[in-house]
């Protein structure tokens, strides 16, 4: 955070999204662990009336319970369910899509692709860590897994849009794309840096 941004916080009110009536809307929010953007997104959308499905690699039932208790304490009728999802695992992604179709019907108004990982915050990795199917771990999770999930749920989104007039995919990103290096996409000899790789993934999500 810049000094200018820090000082600005003392004089300018934090902007909040305008409340939207989401009654009857069905929303999936990936990566909803407590304390995350996904968790607060799910809580806000549920407060606005949406039926929300949250995902996580962790204990989803505990996340759902925490959301329900928090919403009920705020006087909101909780409409939150959840299911495990590991974007690093292609079968987990397909299983979630099957579960959603079987348990949540033929409607999906919004898919919020929030889940992502960065497991090398201190940039100590000298070589890429690979997923079980041979992809760089962050690429497999943040990009390939997200694209697969979107592709598998896209028919429901299209159907919902045709029937109800609107449906959308929201990809959550960050400013880390500014650390990307385009030449790394074409130069196989470029040394590995997890932050630059993460930035390239974030840049790809914006295309």
Regions found by a protein language model. Give the residues of each.
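N-terminal membrane-anchoring alpha-helices
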Residues: 1-13
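Rossmann-fold NAD(P)H-dependent dehydrogenase/reductase core
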Residues: 11-207
């Amino acid at each position: 955070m810049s000094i200018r941004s820090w000082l600005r916080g003392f004089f300018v009110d934090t902007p909040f999204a305008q409340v939207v009536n989401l009654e009857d809307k069905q929303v999936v929010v990936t990566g909803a662990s407590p304390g995350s953007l996904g968790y607060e997104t799910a809580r806000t959308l549920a407060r606005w009336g949406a039926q929300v499905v949250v995902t996580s690699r962790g204990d989803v039932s505990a996340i759902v319970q925490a959301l329900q208790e928090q919403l009920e304490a705020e006087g909101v009728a909780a409409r939150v369910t959840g299911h495990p999802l590991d974007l690093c695992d292609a079968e987990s992604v397909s299983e979630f899509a099957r579960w959603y179709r079987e348990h949540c019907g033929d409607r999906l108004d919004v898919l919020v692709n929030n889940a992502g990982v960065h497991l090398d915050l201190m940039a100590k990795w000298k070589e890429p860590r690979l997923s079980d199917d041979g992809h760089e771990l962050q690429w497999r999770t943040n990009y390939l897994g997200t694209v697969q999930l979107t592709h598998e749920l896209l028919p429901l989104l299209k159907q919902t849009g045709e029937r109800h007039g609107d449906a959308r995919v929201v990809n959550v990103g960050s400013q880390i794309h500014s650390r990307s290096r385009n030449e790394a996409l074409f130069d196989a000899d470029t040394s590995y840096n997890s932050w630059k790789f993460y930035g390239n993934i974030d840049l790809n999500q914006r295309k």
